[in-house]
Amino acid sequence: MTSQEKVPFQVQLSLPQILSRRDWENPQITQYHRLEAHPPFHSWRDVESAQKDRPSPQQQTLNGLWSFSYFTQPEAVPEHWVRCDLAEAKPLPVPANWQLHGYDAPIYTNIQYPIPVNPPRVPDLNPTGCYSRDFTLEPSWLASGKTRIIFDGVSSAFYLWCNGQWVGYSQDSRLPAEFDLTPYLQAGSNRIAVLVLRWSDGSYLEDQDMWRMSGIFRDVKLLHKPEIHLRDIHIMTHLSPEFTSANLEVMAAVNIPSLQLNDPQVTGSYQLRVQLWLADKLVASLQQPLGTQAIDERGPYTDRTQLVLRIDQPLLWSAEQPTLYRAVVSLLNHQQELIEAEAYDVGFRQVAIHQGLLKINGKAVLIRGVNRHEHHPQTGQAIDEESLLQDILLMKQHNFNAVRCSHYPNHPLWYRLCDRYGLYVVDEANIETHGMQPMSRLSDDPSWFSAFSERVTRMVQRDRNHPCIIIWSLGNESGHGATHDALYRWIKTNDPTRPVQYEGGGANTLATDILCPMYARVDEDQPFPAVPKWSIKKWIGLPNESRPLILCEYAHAMGNSFGGFARYWQAFRQYPRLQGGFIWDWVDQSLTHHNDHGQPYWAYGGDFGDTPNDRQFCMNGLVFPDRSPHPSLYEAQCAQQFFQFSLLSTTPLVINITSEYLFRESDNEQLYWRIMLEGESVLEGSQPLNLSPESSQCYRLAEKLPTLNKPGQLWLNVEIRQPKETPWSPAQHRSAWHQWRLPQPLFSPSSDLTNATAHYAPQLQHNLQLQHNRQLQHDLQLQQDEQHIKVTYQQQCWQFSRQTGRLDQWWVADKPMLLRPLQDQFVRAPLDNDIGISEATHIDPNAWVERWKKAGMYQLQQRCLSLHVDHLSHSVQISAEYGYEFEQEPLLHSHWVYRFDRHGRMTIDVNVRIATSLPAPARIGMCCQLADISPTVEWLGLGPHENYPDRQLAAQYGHWSLPLEQMHTAYIFPSENGLRCNTHTLNYGRWTLTGDFHFGISRYSTQQLMVTSHQHLLEPEEGTWLNIDGFHMGVGGDDSWSPSVHIDDILTRETYQYQICWQYKV
């Protein structure tokens, strides 16, 4: 008897009897009466509908409002609930997580299990959701055939009843559970009841770094199949060595009653037909009866067949050119009449590891990947098509070509969209035991083998027809045990067309075809006990190691992070066996919550009263929860771009462009170039880009650099745009860019200016004399008393405090322009990377923030050591020395020289000396609180988005203008943000600053950022806070739990000097 023919127990068990077995605490019981896994079915009854992928009348959705009752434990559910709704039941949408609808609370933890660790036991207080709904069926469904119910995702375990009769049980939150309802259905109204448990023994295998939520969170539908029907379909493509021909191999199995399986008259009367379509063109077709060749001495399979179609000159599938065919598999009866048809998108592509390289269609691929959780700020883990498509389009637009389904099989629609739009996918089993000690405790326990096994094998059986899936993953962070080795072999036997990866046990066990470490660094070894992480350059050179290395996680993008990302891409392009990786991760996993006034905000761990929790560690995304970009997304886009540029010469001006596309011509690209002087274009042009895959071409842009009529920095900007829209991008989408600083040509005033100067020279001389006389009348004035030193020029007055030595006021027409004095600044509001794993209950002394705290950086006591004034012939100079100490230990010394001239300018030279005992400071700079609030900020420097010394590959030097509010990056957990580096001019209202500096400008002070837990709690302060840095430490980002700022980006010198010129335009 096949599994499809298993009938329910003849004696129906009562609800208390069923619950008393506590199946949810038995790892060897993962299901009762659940049907075998298979690819998604639609059961079309005509070929054209299957070929065109029309909605199938044989499917009926059960999404919508269900009746819902909540209990704190399953034993509290009244027995009569399985037959009728309870009086207190309320409507609840399906799909949804019940925690987002007022029941129970979501819990965020990373490693720690949210329940006491006592596998397979779970707490007696086990939140339980009771769902029910009524439905009616077409009479034809009841007259013949089989009706199934399919739950695409239920967390974490559930029991099912139909019309008061128990149907079955299932666990594994991320794979479909399918049951035959046929014996329980009746004419008219039918009632489905589902009891969902929050915790089960399966929860010990689902310890992923994510929100822990419950409920029916994916689609529910009914499917009607004929009595004799297609049971499984496996599609594979095999390409010739030259990729000029292919075999399409289809293995199809038919459900036939077991008593008829050995009757050749029965089995031989059914035929299977495969038709391959390219759009509306029939490319190939083959039909043959059921049955295979003899498998062993007992003979062949009689309920399945293998069909092989040869295709000449197939159009190949890749992420760059995702060409899809459509295979329609039809089951025919002895009269050649269609019984049913199933259809799948087919991509002809080959995945292989050859000579130490992962290759797609014979070409070594560079994985531009990202890890993605299924997450939406409003709906949690219930994701609709619009959200899925939004993620894919954003990934494609920002030069991603791969995604890892971290850490579980995704919604079935995700793979279809990846097939269609072109993304390589790592499909990962729903297994993580990170909170076990050791992690391999369960994977080495035979009693858990079946639970592990089903999560891998059922994933493969559901998803293996998708061309986008190029790698299978055995799960995440579960150590390494005998179970992994066994499942690795199972996959290699059942699907020899794809490699397998698994990071557990050190990323280099026999259970992985790919070295897939997480957070290994480019040049730095991390010799952890048992599982060392070598530098990626070193790893590929270890003895007897020939596998490709693809980081399964790297570049931890938590908050203001992602520093040093460009270093990885320099290594990837330098060493062929370093084939990229998957950034952690795509989206900030924050949930929409509401404060006491009903106002929404983005919440993280602990905001729902959830314990235990790991606070803001859920927010590691390249995009905010609403999918608006973090600045780090642009850095990824630029580093991963498919075109690389080099400047060959400046006279003539020639550049070289290399295409890193493996398969597509650059037939929709236009090259734009501009020569920029101080942010203004002086020469520009454009031309079509015609590059073959993996080719380079030189482009002659100009015969010589333009003659300049004013001094300044000269830059060459190039960018590539797509003139026409594509399925994933709008017209004029910018896909790549680069910038070079050009050598400075001689400054040659224009002839018009020269002639005008000669003609008007006498008048100019007279004007200059008048201007000099006016300057004498409005010379710099100096006033001193016991409390202040004042320097006055026309309507401006600079006031110094003799006590602090600071510029404590800048008067303009008797109006104060400073709310806080101009002073040194050496600290920043800690980044997540600065904090590391330090929390209130656990202090990591190695974290930057702890080192700064211990050294007293946040409690510095300032003293004015000296204050000198010199009134020179054309200026006033004030020299001040400041000492900073903690607990009477001198830590920093700064020497400021202020020069005031007769143009109303204040130029400050700052020299800072750092004690050798002090940890490297976060910044060397100054800050003040301006009284002004101007709507716009303009600057000449790197922009337009936020950038830091170790994250500025994507930023470009130019003249930028943004609204003030956009100068603050609204990270959900407030921290240092908004810096713009390598600035030469800053204009804010009437203020102008010049020099070579970094700056940040905002309505929020560093102090407020330091003490505020959430972005929505920040309160705009009076005026504007201006931070000017001569030097700023990098942000780091190789990971977020250990110091990861590279030594080149740490302020390790003992002395620093910078200069800033301030001016207020009266």
UniProtKB/Swiss-Prot annotation:
It holds the Pfam family Glyco_hydro_2. Its EC number is 3.2.1.23. GO terms for molecular function: beta-galactosidase activity; carbohydrate binding; magnesium ion binding. InterPro entries: B-gal_small/dom_5, Bact_Beta-galactosidase, Beta-gal/glucu_dom_sf, Gal_mutarotase_sf_dom, Galactose-bd-like_sf, GH-type_carb-bd, Glyco_hydro_2, Glyco_hydro_2_AS. Substrate binds at residues 110, 209, 477, 553-556, 620, 1041. Gene3D superfamilies: 2.70.98.10, Galactose-binding domain-like (2.60.120.260), Glycosidases (3.20.20.80), Immunoglobulins (2.60.40.10). Mg(2+) 2 binds at residue 613. This is Beta-galactosidase. It comes from Yersinia pseudotuberculosis serotype O:3 (strain YPIII).
